[in-house]
Amino acid sequence: MSMDADELTIEVSDAETGELVLKQLDKEVLTKGAWQSMMFLYQDRDAKTGEFGEPKVSLRRYQKSQGTFKARSKFNISGKAQAEAIIATLKKWYNI
């Protein structure tokens, strides 16, 4: 069965309780083809409080092989401060 990029998710549930531990809020397909680049907005659940934390971003690369996507690499942006530093650097490098 062939898989579509729209089916990719990073949500994770606890195997024992079925409770969501990583909640996907949004996603963007950055590049399509045999190698897909995607950006996900997500929240982790705090194991102690049970509450979801501040939104984070994960950039991921998937390789499509025999109709399915295999995760090949990822980079997580841990919070607003790191995102702002990345944005500032990209603006400087690309003069935007």
Which residues are covered by each model-predicted region?
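Positively charged, low-complexity terminal tracts
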Residues: 1-84, 88-96
